[in-house]
């Protein structure tokens, strides 16, 4: 069976052709099981490798070869050995010593939804891969070798972001040391991802300096990322995106033995059935089944909201919360984007995290998409072209134009893609599916509303937890005192033709007056 997915990337149409035949299964494929003694190897060591026929990508770009590497990595902590797989795509006339690592939005706890299975066997259980493959095409056409790790690892632990960071960084190590490629330890690396893939990339950015300082990273780009799992669960619960809340809970339970043990006394039989369903089905089925369901309620937990009262959960949530440690502030340039109207990952949690990073020396351009027609899904393609421009500039040795942090608002609407499924392909139930098409940030004018802001302590945007992005459910205390703020825009306007380093953007900007300090948000014991 051949499935076509059309995505407009700038002015060019990308056609992802997924050839489905003879489905592989990670659980039954011996390649995914390392040989005895693998735990004594070092992080990033290659345990096994194989050549593959990446049928979906080959239909769109001329690949010289594709490989998969089984490599040693870490789970939850550098002290806990783990293994994972990365898929390497080598285009014809590949550029030497430049590597792009991609955070694939698996967003699923299902073993057959991992990127490496989707590349080999098609995307039956990896619906997000349909679009993400399309978005790889410009990078491959530019000659960049691309590595796509299974960043959820063999536990398929969606939202276990810290592990995703380790597994992403170790996929880079393994790829750079692979002797079949024209790469070496001095290779320049850049990475991008969205949603769960954005979470893995953002954690790679946060952990790189302490965990893999030898990697020469030029910068990172990510959107729709998950810096606070509890905020996602509260935000998505009892909405049409409730399936993401169920998947987030399941991922943490599967990744942390103490939480898995505690869950047995917290879950009802329906709750255990919910986790089993999440593990056994692709995210499309999970989102459909649990749409508008209160997954935190008494049907699934023996005590309403009891999950958040568990010490085991609070400990795990803190370990996977970003914007809480000065030792985990990314030190290379970042391009981050998020839709204010994101119905899955609350906008404020992303904003608060970036503000924290900025107060501690990060270099970030944070783009807020303000059009209320944008959702979690279609924001991915809307932001894909500026992400490509950012990555390409960095790999070409060009510096970004911001010295500290820049907060920008754009009213760019969604591509004429599905408001239901969107370019990210997971259909949040709204009663229909649409063909993916339209402009991906290339055909609209945009309003930039805010500022080259250096974000000293106590500056930023409104994070008061009110408005359309705040959860209506009461939540336990969660975010540390970040001194969140709200800007007071002035009427001054400045016209810029790609001033933030993206020549493709021609837009109007207005500078914001110094933000005023607002009360710190609660720590969402998320």
Swiss-Prot record:
It is an enzyme of class 3 (hydrolase). The active site is at 195 (nucleophile), 342, 376. Induction: Constitutively expressed regardless of pH conditions or exposure time. It catalyses: a triacylglycerol + H2O = a diacylglycerol + a fatty acid + H(+); a monoacylglycerol + H2O = glycerol + a fatty acid + H(+); a diacylglycerol + H2O = a monoacylglycerol + a fatty acid + H(+). Glycans are attached at residues 186, 228, 377, 462. GO terms for molecular function: triacylglycerol lipase activity. Gene3D superfamilies: 1.10.260.130, alpha/beta hydrolase. Pfam families: LIP (PF03583). Residues 516-526 have a biased composition (Pro residues). PANTHER family: LIPASE 5, PTHR34853. This is Secreted triacylglycerol lipase LIP4. It comes from Malassezia furfur.
